[in-house]
């Protein structure tokens, strides 16, 4: 292999695969990135056996070929180079030689034959075109609710729900649930529900722009194609909890609040909440929402946020970080808080602005004992 590529083009693709590669791996080649030169491009790919990403950049290919090199080291080297052309070639001893301006590097590689094969499109698989900007918005509104506990594998991802008239994403960790849906016209036969693993959701978010996304299933993989790159992930083989009734529950105590004012108040009050629980007390009464937090070791904090609420008083405990996650993603000037009593879940929603297209975003949070 002997190629020349622009530093910026090569760096962009190497940066995107960094999240795929596992830093500590019992299989050495999984720490490597696959480089394949042919035609007028250099293909760049990485996998952890569950999630894979393939991209490419323009290149002048003097001699086609392939090699795998340390993804982390190659990225660090290319990032440090001056803005110039990068000359990469495989030498007779199997090592890779990299030159740029007055810099020269030699790197040990592993043969392409040892690199795992990547998922291909299944024959006859009909892709569905999804609006990229919509999918990116839904991920931003839900991904923080995905559980970090791999043991609860059926919660370790987001449920993607596709229908002819919309796209929805749902995530939960058992303590809170975030649901977001946007109307969209999809060329789809039957409605589709698939569980997208947490890591794949994060990597997809990095790829998404305003351009459409092509999605299809290939054997036991989910495949997303966007901007000339292909992200493939194994499906989660599990049953996502029934969420439909949960997001329909309504509280009779409804307050509308300024999102930024509430977010700032929660952030300040939570500074003196217990470090492990992050619990704060939320008290709703006529004209105001009162937030309090206390810790035997640190002290206590109190702040009120004005609201037009005129119902009966209610007090409930919430995890402050759960509230901040929603408030940071809601994107509207106003949000609504719906409560029933101190022992039932609360519902938060963005308040739609104007008559433009909006996201149906519902965030259900379980209460905490205080």
Spell out what each predicted region is.
Residues 1-370:
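Structural preference for solvent-exposed beta-strand-turn elements
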């Amino acid at each position: 292999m002997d190629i020349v590529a622009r530093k910026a083009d090569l760096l962009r693709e190497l940066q995107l695969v960094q999240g795929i590669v596992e830093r500590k791996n019992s299989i050495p080649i999984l720490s490597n990135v696959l480089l394949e030169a042919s035609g007028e491009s250099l293909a760049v790919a990485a996998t952890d056996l569950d999630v894979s990403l393939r991209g490419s950049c323009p290149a002048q290919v003097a001699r086609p070929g392939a090699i795998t090199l340390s993804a982390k080291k190659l990225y660090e080297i290319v990032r440090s180079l001056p803005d110039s052309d990068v000359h990469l070639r495989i030498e007779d001893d199997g090592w890779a030689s990299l030159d740029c301006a007055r810099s020269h590097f030699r790197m040990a590689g592993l043969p392409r034959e040892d690199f795992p094969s990547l998922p291909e499109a299944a024959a006859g698989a009909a892709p569905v075109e999804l609006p990229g900007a919509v999918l990116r918005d839904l991920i931003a509104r839900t991904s923080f609710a995905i559980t970090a506990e791999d043991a609860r594998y059926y919660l370790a991802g987001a449920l993607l729900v596709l229908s002819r008239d919309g796209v929805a994403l749902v995530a939960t960790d058992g303590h809170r649930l975030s649901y977001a849906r946007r109307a969209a016209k999809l060329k789809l036969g039957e409605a589709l529900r698939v569980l997208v693993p947490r890591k794949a959701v994060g990597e997809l978010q990095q790829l998404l722009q305003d351009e459409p996304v092509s999605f299809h299933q290939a054997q036991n993989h989910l495949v997303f194609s966007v901007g000339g790159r292909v992200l493939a992930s194994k499906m989660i083989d599990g049953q996502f909890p029934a969420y439909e009734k949960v997001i329909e529950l309504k509280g009779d105590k409804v307050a509308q609040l300024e999102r930024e004012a509430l977010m700032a108040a929660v952030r300040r009050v939570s500074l003196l909440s217990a470090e492990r629980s992050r619990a704060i007390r939320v008290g709703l009464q006529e004209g105001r929402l009162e937030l309090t937090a206390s810790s035997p070791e640190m002290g206590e904090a109190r702040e009120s946020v004005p609201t037009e609420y005129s119902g009966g008083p209610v007090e409930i405990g919430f995890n402050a970080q759960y509230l901040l996650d929603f408030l940071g993603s809601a994107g509207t000037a106003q949000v609504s808080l719906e409560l029933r009593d101190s022992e039932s879940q609360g519902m938060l929603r963005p308040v739609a602005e104007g008559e433009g297209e909006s996201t149906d975003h519902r965030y259900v949070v379980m209460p905490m004992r205080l």
